[in-house]
């Protein structure tokens, strides 16, 4: 068991990529440069304890690797709107995010996901990958649109298997979290927003109705 102080520190800093702390503006610049350096580093073979704070204590990192990459992708997408002059740089960095998200050291299938016929009960990984692919399409192009659509349809079908409209997050784990389902729905909305489709409309309506009726107190 962890010492409680250590555990609290892990939970408080788990997503703190490379553990950077400083004044807001200075800290943001340092964080961006650290992340940029990480993404442009060659020979990626998975995250290390020097990349993710939580891995100093938990070897596999509780899935913080794909979540950290998802956060990076959203940041680059947002930066492309606020600072369009640097879009080429953000496109390059987002391409590196996708490469790492699909890497066998990050994806739970341990092989090229394009060769995986059934995506299974890996909703946690897929929700973040789907967000990454949506961000990529938004500012880079359609290279991964087929995979993006495949994941959307898989998550929708899996969600509809349950009366509470919550997709599976991990194999052999029955627990579901509404925050993750909201992220799943957001990832599908991002695909719809990019492509003028309505794949997630029905599921979103049913999930919101279920949450309003049974999921709040």
Feature-to-residue mapping (PLM):
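Acidic, serine/threonine-rich, charge-biased low-complexity segments
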Residues: 1-2
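Long, well-ordered core segments of solenoidal/helical folds
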Residues: 5, 9-10, 14-15, 19-58, ...
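Beta-strand-rich domains and repeat architectures in extracellular enzymes and scaffolds
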Residues: 54-75
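Extended ligand-binding groove/face enriched in aromatic
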Residues: 68, 76-182
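Extended ligand-binding clefts on enzyme/binding-domain cores
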Residues: 146, 174-183, 187-217
């Amino acid at each position: 068991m962890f010492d409680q102080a250590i555990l609290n520190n892990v939970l408080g800093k788990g997503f703190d990529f490379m553990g950077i702390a400083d004044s807001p503006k200075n800290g943001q610049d340092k964080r961006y440069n650290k992340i940029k350096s990480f993404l442009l580093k060659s020979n990626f073979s998975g995250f290390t304890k020097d990349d993710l704070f939580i891995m100093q204590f938990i070897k596999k990192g509780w899935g913080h690797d794909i979540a950290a990459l998802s956060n990076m992708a959203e940041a680059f997408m947002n930066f492309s709107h606020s600072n369009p002059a640097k879009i080429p740089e953000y496109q390059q960095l987002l391409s590196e995010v996708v490469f790492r998200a699909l890497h066998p050291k990050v994806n739970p299938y341990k092989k090229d996901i394009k060769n995986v016929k059934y995506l299974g009960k890996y909703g946690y990984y897929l929700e973040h990958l789907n967000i990454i692919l949506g961000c990529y399409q938004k500012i880079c192009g359609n290279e991964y649109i087929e995979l993006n659509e495949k994941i959307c349809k898989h998550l929708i079908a899996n969600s509809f298997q349950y009366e509470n409209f919550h997709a599976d997050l991990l194999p052999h784990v029955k627990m579901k979290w509404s925050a993750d389902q909201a992220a799943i729905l957001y990832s599908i909305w991002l695909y719809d927003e990019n492509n003028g489709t309505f794949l997630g409309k029905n599921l979103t309506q049913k999930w919101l109705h279920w949450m309003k009726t049974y999921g709040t107190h």
